[in-house]
Structures are given as structure tokens and as C-alpha cells.
Amino acid sequence: MVYLKNILIFLIIFLINPLVKKNKKSTKENDLKGPIALPIIGNLFGLRNDTYSIMDFYHKMYGGIYRLWFGDYFVVSLNDPEIIREIFIKNYSNFSSRPFLPTITFGSFNYRGISGSNGDYWKRNRNLLLNAMKKSNLKQTYDNLSDSVNSLINLMKEFQSSNESFQPDMYLRKYALTTMFKYVFNETVSFENKIVQGEEAELIDNINEAFNFMTLGNAGDFFKILQPLYYQYLLYRGGCFNRIRTLIRNRYIEHRKTIDIENPRDLLDLLIIEYGDHSDENMISIVQVCFDVILAGVDTLASSLEWFLVMLCNNQQIQDTVYNELKETVVGPVVTLNDRPSTPYTMACIKETIRLKAPAPFGLPHTTDQDIIVKGHFIPKDSMVLINFYSLGRNPKDFPDPLKFDPNRFIGSTPDSFMPFGTGPRNCIGQALGMDQIYLLLSNIFLNFKITSENGKKLDDTDYVSGLNLKPAKYKVCLEKR
């Protein structure tokens, strides 16, 4: 009996202590507010399956900055553009690091590359990548981009002429992949077949699986006692990461054998030249940099393309307005980047889609190196910091009636809170190419086709959690020739 009593006392203390620690009221006026945290798990309950709506609910309750507990980690959610810029532009050196979590450790190959690395190692990788990108053959990349657009449009015409329903997800990912393969490896991916198969299909599946592993709310990331076990689980189940790296490493080896430093063929050649000596560490860094570039350039971009088709399929009047603008503006049979300044409504539709369906709702987390007060809010050292892009785009203060799809919000000016690619030194360095890819494909699709659902009803536009990304459910559409 005494034994059971002691166990009960221990359990009560075990549960009460973290409950008090995580919810104690501070006398400091600048301490962050947030929801009550449960013992041990904190605020993790329910997050994995409904992350975005729960975090948006907290934003409405606690404002532009609030605190949470993810297991053992004190988390700060940023939802105010002024605070975000204060942190990641004026104080970026204190917030530039990534937290040490099993998922980031594994996904970045032990904090290498560009997305997951820290400190001087990150600065070196970023600078070398930027140097390589400045020297890359953009004409070659954009010529291939135009070819990819034309190839996909022609493939869609085959579906249209045969009255087949078109399921866009794999084709949009293949489109994104073609640009990355040309840019990084100087390889051309063919659109000849209606079925996406072989190495391309396998790589697309591996990229999708890798993003799913990065879901916010993994218990193994946020309980320190579980982290070693979770890392072993990732080693066992996370073969998708290694399969992608193996594909890149094989191309690295081939490039090393055939490189002409006077005539670099692609980004991989330029990275080999920029890194200099051919040490194993430099090889690993280059492979991981390419890994980061390809993942960021395929899945998030394809998700934005998918959402755009959903939103315009569900808003036929807006779709017709886009078509009329393109028809009146475009001189030739295809839309080019030169047409973009003359098609503001089409661009507004793209921005409105990205606002409402943020491609990376939280991105990757940051961590604080030192205690700091930002805009009157105290953020302690070792806090995990998230930019809540999802709530930024749905703040009624900046976007009245935020759930309504209304491209007119972006006619004339762009609100300060529209920052889907981040801000500061760790923002997305490929955003210009990404926006060009989106504009070229979508404008040409809607110049050529009227898109409707199979049954005449609206497509499901529910937000689906998929790792780091927000994706729609799989869907099919009917293509009608314009």
C-alpha cells in the first residue's frame, strides 16, 4: 500500500511540475502570452492533424506573437509582419540558426547544405551557391522552361481532344522537375508520355515522401528522451532522403569526370568549381545543396500550381477574366515573360492563391542564440521560432474577408504582410525563378483551356497537411479548348 502511495505521489509530482513550469505567470510585462500547456506534451495535442487551423485560432486569440510548448520546447509563433521584419532583418544574426531536431538533422544530412545548416557553415554554403547561381546559364534554363511549358500544353491538348479527364498533380510535379533537372544537371526530361513513370516518377514520390517526414508536430522531435529513438526510426524508414541523395551523388561523380571548368554546363558544374578542392566534405556539401534546391523547387512549386487550378476552376468568372486579359494582351500563340507587366490580373490571381494557400505554411523553424526583446516582447534564448505564413495571409486586418478568393486585393499594390518566400538572409533564394515558372505555365494553360470539374460541382479546396506543404486532395478536371 505504501509502495502504491509513493508511486501515486511521484506521478502527481511528475505531472504537476511541468504543468506549473509551462504555465506559471511571470511578473514581467513583456513575457509572451499563449494557451495553457498540458503536462509533458504541452500544446502538441491535435497539432499533427490540424496544425494550421489551430495555430490560426491561437493567432486570433493572442495576436501577432504568442508562445506555445511543443513537448520540451518553448515555441514562439510570429504572425505580425513588423515583428517578423524586426527579427529576421534587423536581428537576423540572433535568429538565423536551426534547432537541433532529429528531422532537421536527418533531412539536412547532419546540418549540411543550405536549408538546414547553421553559422559560418551556412554562410559559406549560401555565398557559394549565390555565386554559382549568378554565373549560371539562365538563357539555357529559360529556353528549357519554355519548351517544358509547350510540351505540357501539348500533352493537355491530347487529353482535351480525347475527352479524357486530366489529373494534374504528377504532371505539375514533372513540370517543376524538368526545370530543376535542366538547371542543376543540364538534363532534359521528356513530356512525350501521358504516364509519368520510371526515374522521374520514383524521384517525385521520394520528394513527396521526404516532405511528409517534415511534418510539424512529430513527437519524436520535441521530446528529448525520444529523440535518439526517433533518429534511428528515420534511419530505418527515411530511405527516400538517401535515394534522392544517391541520385544526386551519381551525377556529381559523372560531372567530376567530364567537367570543363572553362565551359560549365549547369549549376552542379558551377558548384564544383566554386567549392574548389574535391574533398569528401565538399562533395557532401554540394550534394546536400543540390538536394535542398531540388526539393524546394519541385514540391512547393507544384503545390502552388495545383491550388491555382483549384481556385480558378471553382471561380469561373475569375477564370474568364484571366482568359480575356490574356487574349487581349498576348500577341503570339504563347504567353512569354514579356507579357507579365501587361497582365496584372493574372499576376494578382497567382498572388491571391499563394496568400490563401501558403506553399510552406511554417517553413523550417529557427532558434534564438540569446535572450532578446523585440517590439516589447521578451523571447528567451533557445526558443524555437516559427513564421506563421498561413495566418499572415488570413489576417483580416490586412486582408478583409480573408477566406474569400479575391484577386483584386493585389491590383495596384501588394500588402506588407505578403511574404510567402520569407524575409531576411534566410529567405528563399530561388523565388524569382519559381514565380517565372508559375506565371509561364498558368498563363498558357488558361490561354488555351477552360477548366471545369468533372461533375459541375466545386472541387474540394480543403487544406490538407502534407509535411511542410499545404496541398489539395487529388482531383481531376475537364479541359475545354478556348
UniProtKB/Swiss-Prot annotation:
It is an enzyme of class 1 (oxidoreductase). It is a single-pass membrane protein. The chain crosses the membrane at residues 1-21. Its cofactor is heme. Heme binds at C428. Its EC number is 1.14.-.-. It is found in: Membrane. GO terms for molecular function: heme binding; iron ion binding; monooxygenase activity; oxidoreductase activity, acting on paired donors, with incorporation or reduction of molecular oxygen. CDD domains: CYP1_2-like. One of its GO terms (cellular component) is membrane. This is Probable cytochrome P450 508D1. It comes from Dictyostelium discoideum. The gene is cyp508D1.
